Amino acid sequence: MYSGRLFYFCSMKHLLLFDDPAIRGSLLPFTFTRPIADLRVGILKISEKWEKYAGAEVSYWTQDYLQNLFPRSEQQGIAINGSWLPDSNSWQQVIALKENEALFFGKTLLATACSAQEKSFAFVSEKKIIQATQEPILLQKTWHIFQFNAAEIRKDFILLTAGRKSQPIQDPHTRCYGEHQIFIEEGVQIRAAILNAEGGPIYLGKNSEVQEGALIRGPFALCEGSTV
């Protein structure tokens, strides 16, 4: 037996991440060339975080001049504020929404069902307003990218490594502390480095390189193909 609420969400497989006009301007110049949800905070971009929780693809509702580069899907789906940094509680609130409801925090729209034909958010006025059960983490200022980075690395580390096994460190001259919080993807090269994850996780992305003499303290992330 299923509830109408669950059936509704399961039929809404697509997530549409929208640029909040009240926030986008405060994130310039980064948002000159990309939607808010394409910004990276922690290990993952905001869009990638939502994809991990949803197990579904996302698209973007952004500025007209960016829309061709970041296409909007023609599917009906859930519109989600692109500045919202999700966690498990956020996701539970999203999947609990009914078609006639809109999730707000104060006056800030967080999520609502949305058709592909909508060109503005005027339709939200017809929805039943539901207030979020806890204050959301919103990327509202440029410095939040750095202020939230450590906490987001910790959250993303769990999303990316749950149920997976790290690649081993082959180099005998590399020293590790807090090894249970170090995760190494395939193709990583490490030579004569010190990795200290006692204060937070260390994530080394695919084909990244840690060169000789590097001293790394967590929380820390080296993304795919990068060098330190």
Regions found by a protein language model. Give the residues of each.
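Structural signal for interior beta-strand "rungs" in well-ordered beta-sheet cores
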Residues: 168-228
